[in-house]
Regions:
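Short strand-loop junctions, especially beta-strand C-caps/beta-turns
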Residues: 17-19, 133, 493-497
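Outer-membrane translocation/initiation segment of Type V secreted surface proteins
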Residues: 8-10, 15-24, 40-50, 54-117, ...
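Membrane translocator/pore-forming domains, dominated by Gram-negative outer-membrane beta-barrels
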Residues: 224, 232, 259-516
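Fold-core signature of tandem repeat domains
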Residues: 144-146
Length: 516
């Protein structure tokens, strides 16, 4: 129907429009509803086995024209949706049902009034929501009543500072429900006055609500939400991509000779990373694979510069909310080294990492797509000592990283994660045996132990709540072997590490370098 206009006939006092009966549901989906004084609408179908809200009698109006001056009775298995289509009303209830224990039926919600945006109730108008009604019974003029097992459903995004049922007095049974969709922090004034203390249910498990003096107050549980955000692993896995790139550059510059010609190199590897004991039960496990390609050249007998690109792909999974995050990470970087003496070297590197995160979860509101970026600048110094047949190379450096995470929405809640600035102090000692000749190949076994204390914004700030997210005390061990024949060098290495909050990782890589 385009417009449902209910007004009294000339020879009668009241015009009644029934919707549904004891045998079947009736459904009216109008573009506009104009309900005049002394007119009434009654909805009442019988219950059927397996009934859902889609089987209920429905009166929906995409727009309410003027004040509601007539009477509406919402009986058993019935729904009235004001300023909403029927499809949107069904979707709104299902949002609520999916986030709570509410069901539609004789043991759950038996009748509902959905107010998608505020309406005006005239002094002659009334609405009675009562799921036991099988014959018309109307509330007093100017009143809205919701009986036990009845539901008043409101879209918080459309209410703002207005009154949901303006001009009405609202009476709600203590066993009735106020349902809030698109729930977020805020207050909702339901009516000019309210009697009763209904149960408040939201479509967002991170938002709770209660009713006091006719006002619903909704509050976001930022602590719980922060734990869910940390379980996505977004910030730490962006940092891991940045760290893997930095380690690759460190290995390359440690091996290269300043005066060599153009060198091309490729590294391919993967790792398993786990964080099991973050704040608020946050945890995840990730599998990532990386491939890096770079080129460098000697520009003076003491200096060498290069550039590289790294691509990473994988996923992290958490038992919390069934979270899975499909991650792609691209890193671009520049690096250079300068030989201060034959044994001492200074290395600098710059990297930009961009990650995309495709998050899915059993809690549907956590499903999101958003990006994170890391900008890093680092410098380190190393010195080589020959002790018998072993070269020992200690190094110390400093790296500053800026981690930025895009905002995203969890239902009606906007999540802003503050940018993080961290300062890392990589300390390492590498051990390399003198070359072993084998049929024209020079074999070089090596090992490296590193410790990187981290300072700064190691926690993410989610809506004002600080949540642990980054490992600030990572320890890493590597063992590898390189084999050189002429201009080509092959390498392979295994790695393992541990850190704060039960963080641990293990992985491996292979690589090849060709010097022209």
């Amino acid at each position: 129907a385009n417009k449902l206009n209910r007004k009294p006939a000339l020879d009668t006092k009241i015009y009644t429009h029934p919707v549904g009966n004891s045998k079947a549901a009736g459904q009216i989906d109008a573009k506009s509803l104009e309900l005049k004084a002394d007119s009434s609408i009654f909805l009442d179908p019988a219950w059927q086995d397996g009934s859902t809200i889609a089987d209920a009698s429905f009166l929906s109006a995409a727009a309410v024209s003027g004040d509601l001056a007539g009477q509406i009775a919402v009986g058993q298995n019935s729904v009235v949706a004001l300023n909403s289509t029927q499809a949107n009303a069904i979707s709104a209830f299902n949002q609520l049902k999916n986030a709570s224990d509410l069901t539609w039926g004789t043991s759950g919600v038996t009748a509902a009034l959905y107010v998608a945006s505020p309406v005006n109730v005239a002094s002659t108008g009334s609405i009675n929501v009562n799921g036991i009604l099988t014959s018309a019974s109307y509330a007093n003029a100017g009143a809205v009543t919701v009986a036990a097992k009845g539901l008043l459903l409101v879209d918080q995004a459309n209410v703002g500072s207005e009154t949901v049922l303006n001009g009405a007095s609202l009476t709600m049974d203590n066993s009735s429900y106020v349902g809030i969709i698109n729930a977020t922090d805020g207050t909702i004034k339901l009516a000019d006055s309210i009697t009763g203390t209904p149960l408040v249910v939201t479509d967002n498990q991170f938002v709770t609500g209660d009713v006091t003096d006719g006002v619903v107050t909704t509050t976001v549980d930022n602590q719980k939400l922060a734990g869910a955000v940390a379980s996505m692993g977004v910030q730490q896995m962006a940092r891991r991509a940045d760290t893997v790139f930095a380690n690759t550059i460190a290995d390359r510059t440690a091996q290269s000779l300043a005066g060599e010609g153009v060198a091309l190199w490729v590294d391919v590897g993967g790792e398993r990373y786990e964080a099991d004991d973050l704040d608020n039960g946050a945890q995840y496990k990730a599998n990532m694979f990386y491939g890096a390609f770079g080129a460098d050249v000697g520009v003076t007998p003491e200096a060498r510069i290069g550039a590289a690109i790294q691509y990473g792909s994988g996923d992290s999974k958490s038992d919390n909310y069934g979270i899975k995050n499909d991650i792609d990470a691209v890193t671009f970087g520049l690096y250079g080294s300068y030989n201060v003496t034959g044994a001492a070297k200074i290395v600098g590197e710059f990297g930009w990492t961009h990650t995309t995160n495709d998050v899915t979860a059993s809690e549907r509101l956590l499903t999101n797509d958003f990006d994170a970026d890391v900008l890093s600048l680092g410098v380190r110094g190393q010195h080589e000592f020959q002790v018998g047949a072993v070269k020992i190379v200690p190094s110390v450096g400093v790296r500053v990283s800026r981690i930025s995470t895009d905002s995203f929405n969890v239902g009606g809640v906007k999540v802003d994660v503050d940018d993080q600035t961290i300062v890392q102090v990589p300390l390492s000692v590498a051990f390399a045996a003198n070359s072993i000749d084998a049929n024209g190949w020079k074999l070089n076994p090596y090992a490296k132990v590193s410790f990187t204390p981290t300072f700064g914004d190691d926690e993410i700030n989610v809506r004002g709540y600080d949540q642990s997210a980054l490992d600030t005390l990572p320890v890493q061990g590597n063992f590898g072997l390189s084999a050189t024949n002429g201009n080509v060098t092959f390498g392979a290495a295994l790695s393992a590490g541990f850190g704060q909050d039960c963080a641990k990782n293990f992985g491996g890589k292979v690589g090849v370098t060709y010097v022209f």
